[in-house]
Amino acid sequence: MDLSLEKDSKTELQELLQKRQLPLPKYLNTSPKEGLFESSIVSEQNKHFLGKGLSIKEAEKEAAENYLKHLMKDE
């Protein structure tokens, strides 16, 4: 069994936001088409980060990855 020590993007995002003393993410999940889910996060600067996936978990993960990329770009 392979137990990866890497953190998932949702955990990384939460830890980075806590470190920067920013509000924790709130995910808004929708299912515009059967079998496809969308998740969005709105940042403190009112920027939207969208994720799509075949499950809510996948969509939230992609939204978190997009927000992380934005935050890392600012460093």
Which residue stretches match the model-derived regions?
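Double-stranded RNA-binding/processing signature
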Residues: 1-75
